């Protein structure tokens, strides 16, 4: 596996920053079967952290448990976001507390243009990056702002999903399989953009 040296350097620097997302003794299950058992973690401000594992290892379940989005839910342990107890929240409360999630299926809304997808994300506070700033971050989206979101390429849909998350005022951004099925040139473009986002203070 190739690792971008900038990611390693930035992650090492971030270890000295305060933890913004933490979990202790985290368990989650489907039915009677545990999918996630005894996970502990700290994610620091300015850190890019990756979950690595085979298919079925529980990566998506871990992210969904942190974000409180459906089953499985955490049944034991604690998750804290900037001193706020995520383990006591519903998904909409976690989002309002500053947790952003880009799911693997991206969930681009049919019938809405790129711009309308972003506007919908800002229909209620807390509002994050302005739409024009997001177009500066993702020029491809600015060029296609009037195009229906679901007609974009896979890579452009992923950019839209990330931009939509940033349209909210978030402290942590979780990405589930962000590069799955994308061309290497798009992966490189998104990776560089994520590093730029981190350098802007996330």
PLM region spans:
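Glycine-rich phosphate-binding loops of nucleotide-dependent enzymes
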Residues: 2-202
């Amino acid at each position: 596996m190739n690792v971008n040296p900038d990611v390693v350097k930035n992650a090492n620097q971030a270890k000295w920053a305060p933890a913004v997302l933490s979990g202790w003794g985290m368990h989650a299950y489907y039915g009677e079967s545990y999918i996630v058992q005894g996970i502990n973690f700290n994610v620091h401000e300015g850190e890019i952290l990756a979950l690595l594992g085979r298919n079925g290892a529980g990566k998506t379940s871990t992210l969904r448990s942190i974000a409180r989005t459906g089953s499985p839910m955490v049944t034991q342990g604690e998750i804290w976001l900037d001193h706020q107890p995520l383990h006591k929240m519903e998904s909409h409360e976690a989002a309002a507390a500053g947790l952003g999630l880009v799911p693997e299926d991206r969930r681009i809304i049919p019938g809405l243009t790129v711009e309308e997808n972003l506007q919908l994300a800002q229909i209620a506070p807390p509002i994050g990056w302005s739409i024009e700033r997001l177009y500066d971050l993702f020029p491809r989206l600015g060029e296609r702002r009037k195009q229906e979101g679901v007609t974009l390429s896979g890579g452009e849909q992923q950019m839209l999903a990330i931009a939509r998350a940033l349209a909210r005022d978030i402290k942590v951004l979780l990405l589930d399989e962000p590069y799955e099925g994308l061309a290497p040139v798009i992966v490189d473009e998104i990776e560089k953009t994520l590093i730029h986002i981190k350098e802007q203070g996330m």
